[in-house]
Amino acid sequence: MAVARSSRTDAARPRTGAEIRDAFLAFFEERGHKRMPSASLVPEDPTVLLTIAGMLPFKPIFLGQQERPAPCATSSQKCIRTNDIENVGRTARHHTFFEMLGNFSFGDYFKQQAIEWAWELSTGVFGLDPKNLVVSVFRDDDEAEQIWREVVGVNPKRIIRMDEEDNFWASGPTGPCGPCSEIYYDFKPELGDDGIDLEDDDRFIEFYNLVFMQSNRDAEGTLTPLANRNIDTGMGLERMAQILQKVPNNYETDLIFPLIQAAAERAGVDYHQLDEKGKTSLKVIGDHSRAVTQLISDGVTASNLGRGYILRRLLRRVVRHGRLLGIDKPFLQAMGEASIALMQSAHPQLSERREVILAELQREEARFLETLERGEKLLADVLAAKPKQISGEQAFELYDTYGFPLELTQEIAEEHGLAVDLAGFETAMEQQRQRAKAAAVSIDLTLQDAIDQVAAGLQDTEFRGYEQLEQSSSIQALVVNGEPAQSAVAGDAVQVVLDVTPFYGEGGGQIGDRGTLVADGQAGDGLIVMVESVSRNRSVFVHSGRVQRGALAVGDVVHGRVDRACRRRAQANHTATHLLQAALKQEVDPGIGQAGSLVSFDRLRFDFHCPRAVTAEELERIESLINGWIADAHALEVQEMAIEKAKAAGAVAMFGEKYADVVRVVDVPGVSMELCGGTHVANTAEIGLFKIVSESGVAAGIRRIEAVAGAAVLPYLNERDAVVKQLGERFKAQPGEIIERVTALQDELKATGKALAAAQAELAVAKSAALATKAVAVGDFQLLVERLDGVDGTGLQGAAQSLADQLGDGAAVVLGGLPDPADQGKVILVAAFGKAVIAQGQQAGKFIGGIAKLCGGGGGGRPNLAQAGGRDGAALASALEAASHQLRESL
């Protein structure tokens, strides 16, 4: 029996990238899946440089190394892949950054249910015609083939068996593995079902991959059934957007094309008028802009190592392709702004990290531009000699002297039909390594590179900060002004590694301690370093600050003193965070889990999984409950125990966090028990007071509460009281009368707004009377396309309808304008069509929606009257010209 399809109408089906993402997650959430947030692009898995697949955050669960958060889950995971970076922009579907939609079963449902849901989602929710779909199965997976054919009802000719290379997944040479089944979209179903070749990328696109983890492979290669079978699936968001938005490639979807338009505007070009080379450059800029923005947001900084090198390479490719398009001024910040604006609704952390992102983009672009021009000139001189290839020595000179990445040299050489002598390059590189090693010189290290270098050869730092706030220690290593060093003097920015420390290193959401390092046994004039932050590199604690007086050197003994006031505030906020999670579980939902946190000296922030907003009444009860626990003066109990014992005792662990076999348990008896390595008060009474500042949503299914505790509460209340007093003075009202005064003012503004809108509508209609004379005859029809600024959407609709009424059944009226001429970021477009125009096959809703895309927007409405909007006022004139041209051609 075939699986039934949904009756959802075309209008109700998702189209935009955001709608597709939400529809996918909602579909599986409705079927019992726990909606999980996207993990960072910087993975917990030390064997992987970046998050490359939607299943990566769940890999420890699939491998039996971590408990499952729920029987099944769904997510939209940020991913980065750079293994085929040379294909980005040249093919329809290759990207560096992309989102992978997925549904996962951890020993819950299996093959048949996964297949049925995949088909229901594809044909029902997304409305794909089964005649346009082809499925692949592993060559030996008779069960999957039978389900597709007999249960789902797929035409047997459209079920293709594939080899192990294409349709079998394994976690490694040994371990969990299983067959795959994929769903492909057929862009040319008219070619028939005979001889289907899924390698034909022009005809087929794979958009949904189902992995059935059903076996364990031993060292002999023998497969045995797994006790708990799992499901791992992945649907490319960009690919589904291409299919549903009916565009020729992923780049022209609403997920990327606004960035291409932003780059084209910077270059002063029209994407659709460019040759393939120009389009490729715009696609590279659009793709890489998303990638670098997300990488920086997740904490990656440009460097010459690891993921930092990937970021640097992507940034430099953007600059390079910008120059190919004629952009000779810095523009990375502008692309960063555009990327944040495009993606922040789905990824709110981008707006929170905006300043960091833009600063890194500006800094790295400036650094590259300083050397790029000289490097390009040298390469041009090399190419002018018309060599048969670029020698390894020449490529290395560009890399070593001018900071020119080898990949960039290869790209430019390829554009001229040349190759680069890679073997010669490696020889020159190795010779340089040997010279550097002999001279003991580290070249072009960023601060993080330098810290990584010095920390790599050191033993773990012994942390004694739970018991004491002062400690004498030996300096193990120094980084001075971004370089490994043996000594430092007054004025130097330093990172100090000690063998023993009382300073807490940032971790578990809690920021690192502040304090001082002084010459051992001295004070006052003996002050050496003001410690501003403490971080961890693996288990090596790095104390960052600036030398105030004197000098220090590797091997010196210093005395560390933690700032007691800062530590007390951090402790109060951290314990308050535990109480907050306990109160949320008690008052809102016992299943609430932590999604992230920040414990600083002056505030706390707690992110948690919750499908709805916490009500004002619930927040009031939570606040009261926490202050009650504080007043009850609970003495905290802290102990170390085996993780199995801790979990059996009910200790709360954070999903995604890695724990050792022995863990530290912080217990507020009868209230809260959590696995935690942070610092805490000895008694809840030390917190003093707790006050919630705000509750908000930060992502789908993720809520955030911000609060203050302890010494930070009184300044917060004083600040609020000052605001109330200022409002009272402004409104000439007592505090208790302010709400009444504001409500009256809102009512007055609302009435004034209505009157203004009515006046604008009347004015627009009056203006339109003069426009009617500008209508031109196109056969039996009257065509009028005009610009009318300073009128809102309601007024523009009224004007268009008035003009259509005047011009009769053959009227085709299109009006566009900027409601506020000073704001180029808001465009209004309206179409009004008479009965004869509609009978000709034109519909105002579809027509104006298409025109609005030229202004970076969209919209629609009824066949006779419709409105759309856009974000690019500079494109309005060309959009109106396009509207006139299209109507002249079709009428």
Curated annotation (Swiss-Prot):
Gene name per UniProt: alaS
Positions of Zn(2+) binding: 574, 578, 676, 680
Transmembrane segments: none
Subcellular location: Cytoplasm
Cofactor: Zn(2+)
Molecular function (Gene Ontology), one example: ATP binding
Domain of life: Bacteria
Pfam families: DHHA1, tRNA-synt_2c, tRNA_SAD
Protein name: Alanine--tRNA ligase
CDD domains: AlaRS_core (cd00673)
Listed GO biological process terms: alanyl-tRNA aminoacylation
EC number: 6.1.1.7
Keywords noted in UniProt: Aminoacyl-tRNA synthetase, ATP-binding, Cytoplasm, Ligase, Metal-binding, Nucleotide-binding, Protein biosynthesis, RNA-binding, tRNA-binding, Zinc
Top EC category: ligase
Protein function: Catalyzes the attachment of alanine to tRNA(Ala) in a two-step reaction: alanine is first activated by ATP to form Ala-AMP and then transferred to the acceptor end of tRNA(Ala). Also edits incorrectly charged Ser-tRNA(Ala) and Gly-tRNA(Ala) via its editing domain.
Organism encoding this protein: Synechococcus sp. (strain WH7803)
Cellular component GO terms, alphabetical: cytosol
Chief localization: cytoplasm
Record comment regarding domains: Consists of three domains; the N-terminal catalytic domain, the editing domain and the C-terminal C-Ala domain. The editing domain removes incorrectly charged amino acids, while the C-Ala domain, along with tRNA(Ala), serves as a bridge to cooperatively bring together the editing and aminoacylation centers thus stimulating deacylation of misacylated tRNAs.
Catalytic activity of the protein: tRNA(Ala) + L-alanine + ATP = L-alanyl-tRNA(Ala) + AMP + diphosphate
Family the UniProt entry places it in: Belongs to the class-II aminoacyl-tRNA synthetase family.
PROSITE patterns tied to this protein: AA_TRNA_LIGASE_II_ALA
Free-text comment on the cofactor: Binds 1 zinc ion per subunit.
PANTHER family: ALANINE--TRNA LIGASE, CYTOPLASMIC, ALANYL-TRNA SYNTHETASE
